[in-house]
Amino acid sequence: MARTAPVEPPLRHSAPPSPAAGEPRTSVEAAVAPRRVLFADEALGLPLAQLRRYRPWGGPGAGKMAAAAGQDGGGGGGADEDDDGEDGDEGEEEEEACPEPSPLCPVPAGGGFYLVPTFSLPPAPGRLERLGRVMVELEALLPPPGAVPGGAGVWVPGGRPPVLRGLVRVLNRSFEKAVHVRASHDGWASFCDHPARYVPRSPPWAGAGGTGAGDPILDPGLGLGPGQASASSPDDGGRTDRFAFQLPFAEGAGDGARLDFVVRYETPEGTFWANNHGRNYTVLLRIAPAPTPTDAEGLPQQQQLPQLEPQPECQGPVEAEARQLKSCMKPVRRRPAEEELKTKNMDDNTFAMAEHPDVQESVGPLVAPTPLRPWPQMTLQVSDVPMTGNPAEEGDVPRSSPPVAFTEVLQAPAIRIPPSSPLCGLGGSPRDQASGPDASEGATGPFLEPSQQQAEATWGVSSENGGGLEAVSGSEELLGEDTIDQELEQLYLSHLSRLRAAVAAGGAGGGGEGSTDGGMSPSHPLGILTDRDLILKWPGPERALNSALAEEITLHYARLGRGVELIKDTEDPDDEGEGEEGLSVTPSSPEGDSPKESPPEILSGARSVVATMGDVWLPWAEGSGCDGPVVLGTEGQFIGDPEKGMGKDTSSLHMNRVIAGVTESLGEAGTEAQIEVTSEWAGSLDPISGKEPASPVLLQGQNPTLLSPLGAEVCLSSVARPHVSSQDEKDAGPSLEPPKKSPTLAVPAECVCALPPQLRGPLTQTLGVLAGLVVVPVALNSGVSLLVLALCLSLAWFS
């Protein structure tokens, strides 16, 4: 059950006591008779109203206003004096903070004055951004009231006190704000704070009886005409406010009087100052007589300059603009000697004409500037910079490097480099890989044309170079090497073509039936390299062709002296998995991409049978006999299982260089001999892709012959047998023993053909020329392998 609030009894007002019944009527009427009102002006002689004016600061005129208020209220009662006692004390405190200045002394009527500021006002553009940082800024200085604009600036006639007026722009951070201007006339020995009045956004005289009508500060004498307030203060959406101030000069101020002031802006957030970046604002007073009519009409700019120089700072933006327009209306007459300065002043005149096009007619025609003549062509010398490198290092040009002139550089020569193949890293048959210009294009396979990457690699200079001179020397070295390579290539090819033509002419007459066995197996025993191997072994594509040609020429002459037939060097990549039990070659570097190995050594005294680029007949040494022909065959002619008892190792690299089918009549009938020669190269590298070169084997026969594909017979006088394994006739398959580094390989052969005397002289000269041709590129390219090979050849031939 809800409780109800207690009900208060209604208030009862006691009725006025009624007159006693026995009381007479006349006494009651006398008690309620009306009162009479007495006014102070009638009874006491005081004014009916008392007016007091209060100022929150002790500025100029405060003493006069206080004196007037004292005269008005001098006869007031004690109550009024008590009521106004606090206000009087506050006024006295304010007057103590800012002592009352003496009455202003106007300038004599016969003269006038100018106000000359010693500072420059900040420009209007970017004012809002600056206010965001400093909060308060002095916007403009306004002319004093009664100023007369003349040719020499704004002049104030005599009879008026010198005062300074200005506008302050503040950032509107809060509604409650106060702006004061602290001024000093004696170099800050004493100062006084003057309040600044808020300037509304609309002109105060917009309507009749406006807010600012009659105001001593915001009257038309302030210098802001109709529309000028909005012109000098563009609308910024209420983000800023303007305040106006007026500063008087000291009593008896004469010519050269000084007025220093700063602006203080007080907000609830804090107090901000504008003091001209710590230098304070200073305005000087200049007493000057009234301007003459000539001055009013306008004088030449040179004579007006001393007086007009500080005047734009003393005026607002609008007044300064109007004065500039008038000066533009009367152009300056220049003498012929001043024609040189027209080019410099042309920009200023163009800016003035573009801003005020109506002035162009009065200015007159402008003299067109003289067109600039182009400079004569000259050779510019620029310090060279590295061609390749980091972008941060490209601009760093060493000052110590002498300037060099740019010259046209020929393109790097195109060198045909066969691409890598699965078998040996080269495309096409070995016959056509380094056979020179007479090679057929159809059998060579694809070649790599010089691409942009190769050209960049040719011209690329490492960023590790110390300066521009090293880059220049590197490019010159590359150019010299390429030129030498081209010359060597042409020399090698021409010499080799003559040798081949001679060999082909010699072998054309001794033709026979060709072999039907197909291509011959590659073989080069005793470490002698073919052109294909030279290209593979050489660590750099730009030297491969020349090295192969040089080696072919060297081996050609070597075979001439040793009396060894040329064996066709071809490979049958279709025979897969045959002869994999040959010599296992371990790569010299873990990468295996660009092996850099020294050339194999040539064993003197051993019989060398080398594969070449074709079927060539060579004359044998004198006195050499031939027991019987020797026939070359392929492994496809074996009888039996070629892989019997042979283990395959696909993870290792193999190269079989077996010379088989070379037999000799040993004097015993029915005797079979099989010669197996294996050449082991230290560090040689041939990639294996599932296809091994066919291993040649021995063909049986009493009088075997060597049949070339063209049907030519080769007669061997005596063949060395460094490593021979005999087999019985019952064994049909070949017996391939593991390759061993047998010392018997270096044993001299049974019959070594001596070099004919008629060939020793030409051969010595040829080897000397070839040695010089080989040493030059080796010295340029630092090829140690070719140098070692040349030394080995020299030792082999002349030992």
Curated annotation (Swiss-Prot):
Protein location: Membrane
Tissue: Expressed in brain, skeletal muscle and heart.
A Pfam family annotated for this UniProt entry: CBM_21
Region (Disordered): 1-28, 53-104, 205-241, 420-471, 569-602, 723-742
Polar residues bias (residue ranges): 450-464
Keywords: Membrane, Phosphoprotein, Transmembrane, Transmembrane helix
GO cellular component: membrane; protein phosphatase type 1 complex
Topology versus the membrane: Single-pass membrane protein
Protein name in UniProt: Protein phosphatase 1 regulatory subunit 3F
Cytoplasmic side: 1-768
Gene: PPP1R3F
Disulphide linkage map: none
Acidic residues bias: start-end ranges: 79-98, 571-581
Lineage: Eukaryota, Metazoa, Chordata, Craniata, Vertebrata
GO molecular-function terms, A-Z: glycogen binding; protein phosphatase 1 binding; protein phosphatase binding
PANTHER family reported for this sequence: PROTEIN PHOSPHATASE 1 REGULATORY SUBUNIT (PTHR12307), PROTEIN PHOSPHATASE 1 REGULATORY SUBUNIT 3F (PTHR12307:SF40)
